[in-house]
Design a protein with these regions (language model features):
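Residue-level signature for tetratricopeptide repeat
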Residues: 56, 89-90, 151, 241
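C-terminal soluble interaction/assembly domains
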Residues: 397-497
């Protein structure tokens, strides 16, 4: 009999691996999940990190291999960027305890670096090289707590899940708004940076280069609409988890904010009629898109400005300018998500959080300033290179003239002079290789988080989440949950592909 029970528990645990589902009040089944996950985590071993193999595994959606390589990469030291991916890889592979531990660490890292450097990194980035330390995109700063709340919930720890949402609403959001409130949408540049640009513009005009053309492709100024201010997913979870915890103090405020953020949100989610219960289904679908580097060349990628090297050498030095900034033009891979509750009905899930849209907003906030920063760096380097190059070429030419009449020596010096001119031009072109856009981001967030709900009598319910993708593929994930009178249940399902 004991063997039968053990087999049954193992099968039940395996079911939860494929599609996490739980009733908020029933922690026993979640304890089974946590135990099973802990046992599985021992089998995941670090795999020697290889960038090419890692990218291949990413493209194939081989998350176990990605996790193994990320474990190897972060075994000694992990920055925010790597920790974001490590936490989400743990989440995707069902290792919720490990994911939560890494999210906690990442949260502390982001809070420390962001609160100390946000004004410098955004307001004064134009006079500095690209920051080496990654502080996270704005939505990542807030959603790290939201995802951690989900991790705690999936381990059956409702109290810690709610605490993450409280930390977000009471501590991080006010601090975030204070720091970001004015900085992000300013059009003006740091005064010292503007002075430097004006100085460089004068230097370029001496070489008959009109730097005003460089602003022709300046990205649009961000607006208030581009500022990520709230996590609708956090509000949704707060609405359900606090209600399950017996806390109804924020139901009205959460409902109002959520309705303003998600127009199609069903207001019935905030209230459970007498004698009924609620099945809430949260579905994580797809994989977030990636930023790309936008490169702009002046005069163009195939043409140059020509700078005279002086009256003595009569050479023209080809000069080209390259500026970079982050760009995003990702396409949705998720066509839709439907939730089927057996013997009850089918509903199309509403997008609660769109990570692609979050990423696009983040790019719009940064693009203009990062273009200006790139312009400053590139011009400064090129002007320095031009000045040094002209000085070397003219000095070499004066030496060449002194050898006039000495056929062999003059011939050798002429060859050396031509080589110097060529290498100077090549050196100026090589400067462009150092100019790269900062397109770092967490790569394993879902594309969308979708939600649907059913008001039903108490009882056991079965159903499935149907994921439809733009490539025509359809994936179904079954679930089972218990509904108690007056209480919400939350099913968490995912198909990250």
């Amino acid at each position: 009999m004991k063997k039968i029970i053990k087999v049954f528990i193992l099968l039940l645990a395996c079911f939860f691996v494929s599609c996490s589902s739980s009733n908020i009040e029933d922690s026993e089944s979640e304890n089974i999940v946590a135990t099973e996950k802990k046992q599985r985590s021992k089998k995941i071993k670090p795999i020697k990190y290889n960038e090419e193999e890692y990218e291949k595994a990413y493209n194939q959606r081989n998350y176990s291999t990605c996790l193994g390589m990320m474990l190897y990469k972060t075994r000694k030291k992990a920055d925010i960027r790597d920790n974001l991916d490590l936490a989400m890889l743990y989440f995707i592979t069902g290792e919720y305890a490990q994911a939560s531990a890494v999210f906690e660490k990442t949260d502390a890292q982001m809070f420390d670096t962001l609160t100390k450097s946000i004004t410098k990194s955004i307001g004064k980035a134009i006079v500095n090289e690209n920051l080496k330390e990654y502080t996270g995109n704005v939505y990542e700063y807030l959603l790290v707590n939201t995802m951690n709340s989900l991790c705690y919930y999936l381990q059956g720890d409702l109290n810690s899940a709610v605490n993450q949402l409280t930390k977000l609403s009471d501590v991080k959001l006010p601090e975030y708004r204070r720091l970001y409130g004015e900085v992000l949408v300013k059009n003006g540049l740091d005064p010292s940076a503007r002075e430097k640009l004006d100085e460089d513009a004068k230097s370029l005009s001496a070489y008959n280069i009109d730097s005003s053309v460089f602003t022709a492709d300046l990205p649009k100024k961000p607006t208030e609409k581009d500022v990520y201010k709230e996590s609708s997913l956090a509000r949704y979870l707060s609405l359900i988890l606090r209600q399950a915890d017996g806390d109804k103090s924020q139901i009205d405020s959460d409902s109002i904010v959520l309705k303003s953020l998600v127009k199609d949100f069903d207001s019935v989610d905030s209230a459970i009629p007498s004698g009924k219960g609620r099945v809430n289904v949260l579905a994580l679908a797809g994989l977030i898109g990636k930023q790309t580097a936008k490169e702009v060349y002046f005069p163009s990628k195939s043409t140059y400005f020509y700078v005279p090297t002086g009256n003595s050498s009569y050479r023209l030095l080809p000069v080209q300018f390259k500026f970079v900034y982050p760009s995003y033009a990702g396409k949705s891979t998720v066509s839709g998500v439907d939730v089927v509750l057996n013997n009850v009905g089918t509903k199309s899930a509403v997008i609660i959080e769109n990570f692609n849209a979050n990423l696009e907003k983040s790019v719009k906030l940064r693009a203009r300033k990062e273009y200006a920063a790139s312009m400053n760096r590139s011009i400064t380097k090129k002007v320095s290179g031009i000045v040094a190059g002209i000085a070397s070429i003219n000095a070499s030419y004066e030496g060449l003239k002194m050898l006039s009449g000495r056929s062999i020596a003059y011939t050798l010096a002429s060859i050396a002079f031509d080589a110097l001119c060529s290498s100077t031009a090549a050196g100026l072109s090589a400067i462009d290789l150092t100019e790269t856009a900062d397109i770092r981001q967490g790569e394993f967030f879902p594309e969308t988080v979708n939600a649907a709900g059913f008001t039903v009598p108490a009882g056991l319910y079965k159903g499935k989440v149907v994921y439809r993708f733009s490539d025509g593929s359809v994936v179904e994930k079954p679930f089972e949950t218990e509904v108690k009178e007056g209480k919400p249940s939350l099913v968490v399902s995912s198909c990250i592909k």
